[in-house]
């Protein structure tokens, strides 16, 4: 069930981080990346979780110069995880667009 909820919420989290980056919103980057980091760790997606942590730290330290690049890396990592998420959820209709 956690996988299904995560898949449903993932596009919103990614949109939130992307929007915060576009608006140079340090707090928004940190907050949304922190929210995203939790389920990534719970599901065992440690590389993606570490990338979300990097974004969170960038936001908290007001050092978002590389946030766009880090977000791109996180998006690519999540795209690689999509087949596993679909397999774990058993529901192909929940495929996400991590771009």
At which residue positions do the language-model features occur?
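Long, amphipathic alpha-helical coiled-coil segments characteristic
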Residues: 1-35, 39-42, 46, 61, ...
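Hydrophobic, amphipathic alpha-helical faces that serve as interaction scaffolds
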Residues: 51-60
């Amino acid at each position: 069930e956690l996988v299904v909820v995560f898949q449903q919420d993932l596009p919103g989290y990614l949109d939130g981080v992307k929007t915060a980056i576009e608006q140079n919103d340090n707090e928004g980057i940190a907050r949304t990346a922190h929210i995203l980091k939790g389920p990534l760790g719970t599901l065992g997606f440690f590389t993606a979780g570490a990338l979300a942590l990097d974004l969170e730290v960038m936001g908290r330290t007001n050092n978002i110069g590389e946030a766009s690049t880090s977000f791109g890396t996180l998006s690519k990592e999540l795209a690689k995880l999509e087949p596993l998420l679909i397999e774990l959820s058993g529901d192909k209709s929940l495929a996400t667009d991590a771009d």
